[in-house]
């Protein structure tokens, strides 16, 4: 079971979109995938989970982390069929929000290990776990980094997209030093990319420089800017279910292939 966190401590760079599409792309390749929503906005849950499945009274990742509830009882299947399995460990906006988790956990010595402990219950069940994270350096983010084998960093072709990279490197370095020495940066993924524009070309060069500083790679396929992604979110579905022939779907599928070349886990490592 390979655990990957989608992380950037700047908001609006495509973290949740990348988590959704990577999880769906892996499931489309016949693998068993668990998507974990660690973002208080719960947008991954709203996209992949059937309406009401994570509503009032339902177990969510909050109860798993704060109360020690069995994570297997909180998992719900995706609302849309795939060739493999796509399940979700959901967040919720309807009752106990992840935004108050810091207060619930306090300074417990295991506060950064709650998610990794919960995910151990799924060994032998899933090929991949994909974690969506908040744009913050908080207990949620450190739980994700402590649980992860690898990190994918989405970044948009803008002057401000790189703002979250330096603090993220510090967070990863601290995680490696204190809670999870195995975590590595798998690569940087360019999102919302407008081919042929001067800004995108300049930022692609800048992202390559960032990757070199981080000791990692830039994935070969940037994710094209397209309205189909926003439309798929409005339809509460992944891009492959919404329009498998659009440029973003092709790009995310190509990225998934490159991701698997980096991490393995093609379905035989369960």
Regions found by a protein language model. Give the residues of each.
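P-loop NTP-binding core
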Residues: 1-270
């Amino acid at each position: 079971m390979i655990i990957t966190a989608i992380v950037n401590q700047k908001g609006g760079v495509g973290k949740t979109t990348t988590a959704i599409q990577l999880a769906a792309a892996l499931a489309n390749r016949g693998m068993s995938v668990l998507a974990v929503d660690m973002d208080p906005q719960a947008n991954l849950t709203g996209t992949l989970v059937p309406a009401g499945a994570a509503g009032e009274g339902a177990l969510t990742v909050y109860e798993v982390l704060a109360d020690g509830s069995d994570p297997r009882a909180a998992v719900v299947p995706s609302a849309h069929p795939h060739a493999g399995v796509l399940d979700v460990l959901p967040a919720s906006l309807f009752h106990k929000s992840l935004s108050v988790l810091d207060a619930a956990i306090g300074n417990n010595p295991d506060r950064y290990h709650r998610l990794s402990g919960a995910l151990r219950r799924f060994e032998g069940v899933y090929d991949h776990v994909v974690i969506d994270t908040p744009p913050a350096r908080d207990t949620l983010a450190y739980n994700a980094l402590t649980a992860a084998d690898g990190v994918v960093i989405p970044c948009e072709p803008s002057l401000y997209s790189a703002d979250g990279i330096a603090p993220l490197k510090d967070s990863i370095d601290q995680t490696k030093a204190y809670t999870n020495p195995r975590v590595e940066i798998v690569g940087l993924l360019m999102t919302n990319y407008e081919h042929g524009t001067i800004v995108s070309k300049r930022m692609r060069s800048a992202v390559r420089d960032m990757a070199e500083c981080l000791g990692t790679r830039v994935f070969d396929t940037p994710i094209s800017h397209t309205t189909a992604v926003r439309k798929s979110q409005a339809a509460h579905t992944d891009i492959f279910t919404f329009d498998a022939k659009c440029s973003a779907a092709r790009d995310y599928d190509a990225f998934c292939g490159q991701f698997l070349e980096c991490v393995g886990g093609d379905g035989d490592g369960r």
